[in-house]
């Protein structure tokens, strides 16, 4: 079970073997710790030492996200398992094998980008959007043609891939600009200081996705701070951002674009003083993203939820690192 605690003045307590969620003096919910897989906190509140201990001892992942989509902190139970896996991960992140998995992740992202704008343009049939789509298709071919070996310059190759990915993303967001209603005021992607509801909603929803991806990586014994594509930075969960690339369009972009196109969200839902999203819309976004995460599709011959697919992709990373099995990214043609 995933617990998501949103809003102000909420607190987390321990009562026997239960987690108790309270607001001011009132009890909102109590859940047996054995039923909880992870807890995501979005907002301001407090948690008792006893609750922290109970959460940690039962290996429940705890993550805090601010209203702008930034991960504040995570809590994980200390483990000395999977040392060999971690060593392989660190080694691979610094050689050509890491580039191979990064290439697959980028290619999957671009396939999903192409599929998303193709779906959005199905009825509109805008010619300039078709040009952007063709540009992304060329970028997919460029990425797919890259080959890496033991003598490959890691930094240069990574920069080249990110350059191709960056160009494809420019085309993707230009296409999105053409496809969304003009009155919504979306002109370009802004992940730092969004002043429109579309960008703010994307940032917020990506944070929810980050929580899901981070959970899958940790469960499978991987170090979320050691990535293959994104450069390692202090306090940045690089591998989380790597794997997120495969799921951004299907789990976040399509959800937010649908809310915009059906006028369920507008710029009136954005507080212009600090560019934060209203409480009702935050709850709406959380609900829609989690509904999508828990929805099922047919993937590689199995009927799986997106949450299960994220876990499956994390396991593919493990099998690539330990057994040398080929890694294939997640993408859909629609």
UniProtKB/Swiss-Prot annotation:
Gene Ontology terms describing biological process: defense response to virus; maintenance of CRISPR repeat elements
Organism phylogeny: Archaea, Methanobacteriati, Methanobacteriota, Methanomada group, Methanobacteria
Chain positions recorded as Mn(2+) binding sites: 165, 230, 245
Any GO MF annotation of the entry: endonuclease activity
Protein name (database record): CRISPR-associated protein Cas1 3
Disulfide bonds: none
Cofactor(s) recorded in Swiss-Prot or TrEMBL: Mg(2+); Mn(2+)
Entry keyword annotation includes Nuclease: yes
Biological role stated in the UniProt entry: CRISPR (clustered regularly interspaced short palindromic repeat), is an adaptive immune system that provides protection against mobile genetic elements (viruses, transposable elements and conjugative plasmids). CRISPR clusters contain spacers, sequences complementary to antecedent mobile elements, and target invading nucleic acids. CRISPR clusters are transcribed and processed into CRISPR RNA (crRNA). Acts as a dsDNA endonuclease. Involved in the integration of spacer DNA into the CRISPR cassette.
Keywords linked to the UniProt accession: Antiviral defense, DNA-binding, Endonuclease, Hydrolase, Magnesium, Manganese, Metal-binding, Nuclease
Protein family (similarity comment): Belongs to the CRISPR-associated endonuclease Cas1 family.
Species per Swiss-Prot/TrEMBL record: Methanobrevibacter ruminantium (strain ATCC 35063 / DSM 1093 / JCM 13430 / OCM 146 / M1)
Matches recorded under InterPro entries: Cas1, CRISPR-assoc_Cas1, CRISPR-assoc_Cas1_C, CRISPR-assoc_Cas1_N
Complexes and interactors: Homodimer, forms a heterotetramer with a Cas2 homodimer.
Pfam families, A to Z: Cas_Cas1
Gene this chain is encoded by: cas1-3
